[in-house]
Regions:
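Short N-terminal targeting/anchoring amphipathic segment
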Residues: 140-146
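Active-site rim/loop-helix segments in enzyme catalytic domains that contact anionic ligands
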Residues: 1-140
Length: 146
C-alpha cells in the first residue's frame, strides 16, 4: 500500500456500522496513523438492530484505541438501524427505526454528533443525515475521506 498520500494529512473515515472501522478500514487506519496529521472515525449507525447498541459503540472505542486513535477522534452520528433502502432520498420524510425510534442517539457519556452541535436529537431522514455529514466534513476539514 502506497502510504505517502496520507503523510501529514487529515483523514476522515466514515463507516456505516460499528465494527466496520476495523473490518473495512482497520489496516489502512493502523498504517496511516503513524504518518497522518490526524484520523477521525465517524460511525453512521448504532448497530442497535438487536438492542446491543451501547456494547457495540463501546467496542468501537476500544478498537480504534488499539489502532492508535484517541477516543476524542471518534464521532457517533447516532442513527439507529432502519430500512434506509426503501426511504425517500429526495424528500424529508422521516424514517422509523427497526426498534421504533424516530431520532438519533448514542451513549450518555458520548452523545451523538447532532446533539453535540445543536443540543437536540435529529429526526431520522436523509436531509438530516446529509446535513450532519456536511457539517462534520466542514468541522474536520479532512484532506482525505475514506
Amino acid at each position: 500500500m502506497q502510504l505517502d498520500i496520507f503523510k501529514n494529512k487529515k483523514i476522515l473515515v466514515i463507516v456505516p456500522h460499528p465494527d466496520d472501522e476495523i473490518n473495512l478500514a482497520g489496516a489502512l487506519i493502523a498504517s496511516a496513523n503513524n504518518i497522518a496529521e490526524s484520523i477521525h472515525i465517524a460511525v453512521m449507525t448504532n448497530g442497535d438492530y438487536y438492542g446491543m447498541y451501547s456494547r457495540r459503540l463501546m467496542e468501537v472505542d476500544g478498537s480504534i484505541r488499539k489502532l492508535g486513535i484517541v477516543s476524542e477522534n471518534l464521532i457517533y452520528l447516532g442513527y439507529p438501524e432502519a430500512d434506509f433502502a426503501s426511504a425517500d432520498f429526495e424528500g424529508g420524510k422521516n424514517i422509523i427505526s427497526y426498534r421504533g425510534l424516530k431520532h438519533t442517539y448514542a451513549l450518555k457519556e458520548k452523545p451523538e454528533y447532532h446533539w453535540l452541535k445543536t443540543g437536540e436529537h435529529a429526526l431520522i431522514n436523509y436531509k438530516n443525515i446529509k446535513s450532519d455529514i456536511e457539517a462534520l466534513i466542514s468541522d474536520i476539514q479532512p484532506d482525505i475521506i475514506v
